[in-house]
Amino acid sequence: MSEPAHDVAEQQIDPWEAAYLRFETQEEEIRKFTDRLRRLGAGEWPRESNVVELFCGRGNGLHALARLGFRNIEGVDLSPRLLAEFSGEALCYVGDCRELPFADQTKDAAIVQGGLHHLPVLPDDLERVFAELRRVLRPQGRVLFVEPWLTPFLRALHGVAQHPPLRRWSMKLDALATMIEHERQTYENWLDRPQEIAQLARRYFRAEHESFAWGKWNFVGRPRL
């Protein structure tokens, strides 16, 4: 079941969420998301599009979409604590992205920025999310995914994050290392399955853009009918 985030009581923050909140400021993350969405083509989408962001967290991706001029925006995330951080106009739901609270073919675009790698059971959960996305998207809709990928850059970053002196020197690096520690099982399970993940995405969506750089997988596509 899903419910509007503002109806959910505050919950005690967990260690992963605490690290996420100190990894970068709200403004830093909004600027990052705005630049990323523009770079991946979202700046060219019609502004009246119905756009939903899955795993939207504290809603900075929703703020980025609003800055780009989108007016019909919704978000879904499992964490009421993170959603309580959002102060924008988009309607946000506490809900499971494997079972979306939307009718068939009602969305023009769906965005995931760093949420798929949190899924506990791969590939089953990933296929459930992809099937739900294909269900709620209109035939000419789009998906946009940005997820961690084990490029040489990310391997090097993992190595640096293992050194306590460097973590003490950089709050951002320490926050990243803490997030990895608290999601290690799902994170490493995701990174260990690159071919399987990419093939599953291409089975559900026809790629218009796909790239692997700076520790990220960037995918933009349309649903296969």
Where are these regions (language model features)?
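A short glycine-rich, Lys/Arg-flanked "PGG" loop and its adjoining helix->strand segment in the class I
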Residues: E127-P139
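Short catalytic micro-motifs in class I SAM-dependent methyltransferases
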Residues: G114-H118
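Conserved class I S-adenosyl-L-methionine
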Residues: M1-P46, E48-G57
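Class I SAM-dependent methyltransferase SAM/SAH-binding core
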Residues: R58-E99
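C-terminal alpha-helical "lid/dimerization" subdomain adjacent to the S-adenosyl-L-methionine
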Residues: V146-R202, E210-S211
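Core SAM-dependent methyltransferase catalytic element
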Residues: R203-L225
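A conserved beta-strand element that flanks and buttresses the S-adenosyl-L-methionine
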Residues: I111
